[in-house]
């Protein structure tokens, strides 16, 4: 029976002449999509590991039990040797008028057999005590069934994390006390000086992640029914999906400890993470049916084997038949993907849109500088990109933004108008070409004239440029200065579009001093600033044209070919 609200909705939809059917289906589809979005991406599966015999020995060797067992076996061997072995003895007795008497007897007949027996009894007592300690540890283990483990894992995944910091300010106070000492039977009193720790201030704080958000990225624990027993270990950890979330964590942490650092002579810093409203247990053992465990896990079988000095083989068998699983409860702070902070506050900047998406999470590390440097190198938000990163940038979206700016001046359209119609026509051609490989260079700063020539849709003939499909050559950047000529040169080929850029890149080192002077005259003005280095054009090298049919020596770099005349 449906609730009144649902019934009213159905009657209203029916009165509308059947027009509410598609609306209801759309609402159901939207609700299902929202539920799927709430569930998040599919989790990875984790299964318990069944160890081999050697790994089970290395994991838990029980060396004390093994050593005591070997010593007891040695004592039993000595007693058995005393009863089995016979030696020939020669004695002289006055009853036989001074004649010698030879007979066979045990080597331990004179009471030597009691020595290994005493050692055996002592070792057996120590052995039973060690077995009692082992059984007590097993009894203290938290034994649960498989369904309880699943429920506990689900609660830990849904639990709210709390990263806490604690600062304890303290100092030491010099105190004295009277103690009584004894020397040569005489008692005398002396003064002892000691230092006592005094805590003066205790402060606690938590990480406020309301702005960056958090979600659980733990794996799904499956396959617990396949093993007779599974030993589980749970650990808690956290990571960051964006540098903004990590910077927020580090800033709050540094601010908290900085506020409490100078309150006293010393400060003890503690930090950790706990899950709210969850009884966290690090170790537990899961059975399909805890009321009926395997025979080797019963206490009666354990004590029977212990009395027969067979406790160590039983323990090895139990370790071999027990599966192990180390489960990490991981919480991810921050939103996945590039520009999490900017997406929450507004649109992306042009430089952020050109950056590749973030594909790896940033784990929590102890060193702050290395994490920030790794992020800056990866995202390239504050460092000037290299040539290989500049050629991978998508200029089509940049050209669209520059073309739609109208007559106004845009910073991204400087140095030759990268977003002009020529660049818009070049981008589809580059995407459709399957044989093109982008050239790689670690240091190249483009000049103003080179960029204007490259971005010009229809440059006239002259020393600095030519027709769209002509054979002009121009300098894009200087690597070693004016005295050592090593220039990137490009020669355009025949393509379908008239405004296409060059299709072959060559590295020439045979320029003379006259060429250097011409290049110096051509490079009028200083190089572009760092901000404009993000909008450099793309150089393309054809694998077939650049590698075959030339007498120069080819240089291969990551699948592409750059000609050089060494």
From Swiss-Prot:
Topology term for the membrane: Multi-pass membrane protein
Record keyword Repressor present: no
Region (Disordered): 1-25, 495-529
A single Gene Ontology CC term: membrane
Biased composition (Gly residues): 12-23
Residue ranges with Acidic residues bias: 514-524
Name recorded for this polypeptide: Transmembrane protein 151B
Residue ranges that the Swiss-Prot or TrEMBL entry lists as coiled coil: none
Residue ranges crossing the lipid bilayer per the database entry: 65-85, 112-132
Biased composition (Low complexity): 1-11
PANTHER family: TRANSMEMBRANE PROTEIN 151 HOMOLOG, TRANSMEMBRANE PROTEIN 151B
Chief subcellular location: membrane
Biased composition (Polar residues): 495-512
Pfam short name (any one): TMEM151
Location(s) in or outside the cell: Membrane
Keywords on record: Membrane, Transmembrane, Transmembrane helix
Family: Belongs to the TMEM151 family.
InterPro entries in the cross-refs: Tmem151
Gene: TMEM151B
Domain of life, source organism: Eukaryota
Species annotation: Homo sapiens
Disulphide bond pairs: none
């Amino acid at each position: 029976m449906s609730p009144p609200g649902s019934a009213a909705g159905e009657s209203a939809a029916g009165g509308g002449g059947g027009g509410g059917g598609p609306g209801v289906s759309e609402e159901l589809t939207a609700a299902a999509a929202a539920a799927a979005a709430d569930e998040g991406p599919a989790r990875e599966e984790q299964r318990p590991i069944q160890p081999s015999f050697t790994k089970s020995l290395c994991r838990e060797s029980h060396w004390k039990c093994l050593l005591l067992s070997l010593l007891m076996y040695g004592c039993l061997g000595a007693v058995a040797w005393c009863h089995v072995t016979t030696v020939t003895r020669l004695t002289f007795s006055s009853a036989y008028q001074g004649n010698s008497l030879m007979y066979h007897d045990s080597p331990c007949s004179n009471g030597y057999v009691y020595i290994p027996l005493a050692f055996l009894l002592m070792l057996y007592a120590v052995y039973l005590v060690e077995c009692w300690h082992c059984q007590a540890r097993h009894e203290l283990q938290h034994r649960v069934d498989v369904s309880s483990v699943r429920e506990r894992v689900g609660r830990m995944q849904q639990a709210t994390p709390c990263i806490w910091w604690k600062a304890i300010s303290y100092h030491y106070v010099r105190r004295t006390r009277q103690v009584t000492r004894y020397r040569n039977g005489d008692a005398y009193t002396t003064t002892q000086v000691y230092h006592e720790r005094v805590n003066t201030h205790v402060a606690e704080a938590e990480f406020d992640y309301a702005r960056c958000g958090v979600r659980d990225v733990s794996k799904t624990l499956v396959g617990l029914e396949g093993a007779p027993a599974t030993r589980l270990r749970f650990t808690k950890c956290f990571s960051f999906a964006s540098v903004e979330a990590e910077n927020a964590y580090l800033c709050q942490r540094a601010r908290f400890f900085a506020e409490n650092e100078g309150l006293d002579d010393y400060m003890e810093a503690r930090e950790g993470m706990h899950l709210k409203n969850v009884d966290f247990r690090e170790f537990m053992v899961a059975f399909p049916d805890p009321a009926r465990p395997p025979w080797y896990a019963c206490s009666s079988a354990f004590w029977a084997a212990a009395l027969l000095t067979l406790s160590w083989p039983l323990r090895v068998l139990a370790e071999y038949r027990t599966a192990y699983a180390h489960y990490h409860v991981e919480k991810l702070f921050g939103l996945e993907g590039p520009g999490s902070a900017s997406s929450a506050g507004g649109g992306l900047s042009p430089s952020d849109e050109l950056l590749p998406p973030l594909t790896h999470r940033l784990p929590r590390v102890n060193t702050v500088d290395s994490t920030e440097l790794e992020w800056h190198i990866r995202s390239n938000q504050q460092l000037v990109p290299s040539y290989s990163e500049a050629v991978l940038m998508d200029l089509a979206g940049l050209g669209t933004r520059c073309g739609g700016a109208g007559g106004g001046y845009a910073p991204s359209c400087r140095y030759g108008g990268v977003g002009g119609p020529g660049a818009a026509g070049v981008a589809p051609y580059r995407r459709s070409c399957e044989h093109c490989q982008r050239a790689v260079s670690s240091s190249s700063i483009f000049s103003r004239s080179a960029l204007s020539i490259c971005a010009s849709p229809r440059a006239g003939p002259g020393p600095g440029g030519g027709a769209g499909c002509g054979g002009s050559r121009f300098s894009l950047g200087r690597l070693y200065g004016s005295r050592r000529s090593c220039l990137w040169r490009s020669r355009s080929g025949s393509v379908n579009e008239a405004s296409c850029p060059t299709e072959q890149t060559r590295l020439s080192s045979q320029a003379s001093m006259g060429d250097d002077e011409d290049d110096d005259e051509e490079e009028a003005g200083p190089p572009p600033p760092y901000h404009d280095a993000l909008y450099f054009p793309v150089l393309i090298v054809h694998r077939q044209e650049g590698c075959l049919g030339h007498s120069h020596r080819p240089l291969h770099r990551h699948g592409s070919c750059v000609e050089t005349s060494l």
